[in-house]
Amino acid sequence: GINEVIVAHGDPNPLVRGNGISVLEQAGIKVQSGLLEKEAAEQMREFLHWCQNRRPYVTVKIATDSTGSVDDLSLEAQRFTSDECLERVHQLRKDSCAILVGANTVIRDDPQLTVRLVQTDRQPLRVIIDPNNRVSPSAKLLNDGNPVQHLTENFRGLPALLDMLGDMEIQRLVIEGGPTTINYFLEDGLVDEFIHVISEVNHVKPVPSNFDLSSFSKVETSNWGIEKVKIYTK
């Protein structure tokens, strides 16, 4: 039989909260907890955040040119990062429960926001903030058969949106929208992680981003393909 169990991190889920350890101890099994607790907490980051806040962990992912521009209005909407970077974005989508954009992104890019470049058994929920109902009924997001929440007159603001997603057990939300949507989240202090992908290109007719990242205390650097990446957390 089992004589001893080592638990890295307690379960904060209010439906469980310590009951598992109590059951083991009542059965005469010795329980040790706290081994590699910090590492376990990092691995369960989104789940712990959801349990404690009943809202998803919010990640922003944005790509800019070398000057901080998010788009080049001299061209048709197109990707300006490498294939390797795109694969990392699809992995990020796979690791998420929902992807969010605003109406401007759907109108400009007509994106799919699905996982296609890595193997997956499910697609994330796509969320569109469109309070003025400007998105065309023919948009790919509304017609591909994958899960979507199109928020029009029923949009009640960002805190209410995060509460709704939390009630749906969405544990991680990735924002892939443009600067308007992202800045609304930043201004309300609702972003937990900010992933800035920096391309080597220079836009001819740039769209400045003007993101205020002063609320983030930590930054890590990485590479997604040839692109440099800065990951900001609190």
Regions found by a protein language model. Give the residues of each.
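Zn2+-dependent cytidine deaminase-like catalytic core
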Residues: G1-A40, Y184-L186
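Enzymes that bind and transform nitrogen-containing heteroaromatic metabolites
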Residues: G10, R17-S22, W50, Y57-K234
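Short, well-ordered coil/turn segments that N-cap beta-strands
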Residues: I29, R54-P56
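Short, structured interface segments
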Residues: L36-C51
